Amino acid sequence: MSETAERKPILDVVGIQKLLPHRPPFLLVDRVVEFEPNKRVVALKGVTMNEPFFQGHFPAQPVMPGVLILEALAQAAALLATLSMKPEEVNDKITYLMGIDAARFRRPVVPGDRLELEVEVTKQKGAVWKQTGVARVDGQVVAEAEFMAMLADRER
């Protein structure tokens, strides 16, 4: 078990739901364990056999779909941007994913794994953020990608 996995969360799933519009079963981040404003976030996702996607992907040999690993990284990236905002701005903004580049999958993620989602800002100009994300299980890279996202006004 990694040092990060044992640390007390900075933000739990209840707090995450106050910041992200996603809800189960599409909320793919359980907690935030490290955060540096405008720089970096580390979040965790416990992968259990109860995940609805395992019913069809694949019943005899369950594997978390790669696109959902990328979505978990994108949600961690959105948390990084949201947590970096001024508190009075949080309820007025939403993060939209604009693009994914250089996505690579290194090994399957299966029930019982704990995804460690690390996202770092590579560039930020105005409302547009460029970030890199790496997903690990037990310290081994399982997926990585580059993301571009934009903070926009929330529709009321």
From Swiss-Prot:
Q: Which SUPFAM superfamilies match?
A: Thioesterase/thiol ester dehydrase-isomerase
Q: Does the keyword Secreted apply?
A: no
Query: Which Gene Ontology MF annotations are present?
Result: (3R)-hydroxyacyl-[acyl-carrier-protein] dehydratase activity
Q: Is Lyase among the key words of this record?
A: yes
The identity of this protein, by name, is 3-hydroxyacyl-[acyl-carrier-protein] dehydratase FabZ
Compartments annotated for it: namely: Cytoplasm
Q: What does this protein do?
A: Involved in unsaturated fatty acids biosynthesis. Catalyzes the dehydration of short chain beta-hydroxyacyl-ACPs and long chain saturated and unsaturated beta-hydroxyacyl-ACPs.
**GO BP terms:** fatty acid biosynthetic process; lipid A biosynthetic process
GO cellular component entries? cytoplasm; membrane
Catalytically driven reaction(s): a (3R)-hydroxyacyl-[ACP] = a (2E)-enoyl-[ACP] + H2O
- Location of the active site: H57
Q: Which residues form the signal peptide?
A: none
Stored InterPro entries: FabA_FabZ, FabZ, HotDog_dom_sf
Q: What is its EC number?
A: 4.2.1.59
Family label:
Belongs to the thioester dehydratase family. FabZ subfamily.
Q: Which UniProt keywords apply?
A: Cytoplasm, Lipid A biosynthesis, Lipid biosynthesis, Lipid metabolism, Lyase
